[in-house]
Amino acid sequence: NEMYRVLKKDALMVSFYGWNRVDRFMAAWKNAGFSVVGHLVFTKTYTSKAAYVGYRHECAYILAKGRPALPQKPLPDVLGWKYSGNRHHPTEKPVTSLQPLIESFTHPNAIVLDPFAGSGSTCVAALQSGRRYIGIELLEQYHRAGQQRLAAVQRAMQQGAANDNW
């Protein structure tokens, strides 16, 4: 309910979910007032958590509050998920997978909220997309990793290109 409360009117939320809990997620989203307006599948080139099957995808629902404007360039419903090699967090999302979502579903200078920020991938993607961000993380080790990561990205963005003075 809190996500629905803080989300602006006529806005979208993207929620990643575990396939084995989709019924609980769906009930919670609908009880909060969200409408499900899309589903995304991210294909991986590697397998995670192989038990009965090796999982090579991640999924997310696109949820709406009100009637958000349609994106100028709609995304395909199947997107890539490139492993970055960064292991700041056990369920880290690649910035390259999050950035298209942010750029498609928000406008420049909008605020992107990640209430489960982990090591800050969503915040990095928002920053690199010209959006403001709020990241919330309860575990100190991931909060610290996220702060360090964002500071490094901000430093890199403030530095000029190597050929700026030519």
Residue ranges and their predicted role:
Residues 147-166:
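S-adenosyl-L-methionine
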